[in-house]
């Protein structure tokens, strides 16, 4: 988890 959430990170997680 990151303090800053970016759409690109969400893609990675999802």
Curated annotation (Swiss-Prot):
It comes from the Eukaryota. Belongs to the serpin family. In leeches, the angiotensins are involved in diuresis. This is Angiotensin.
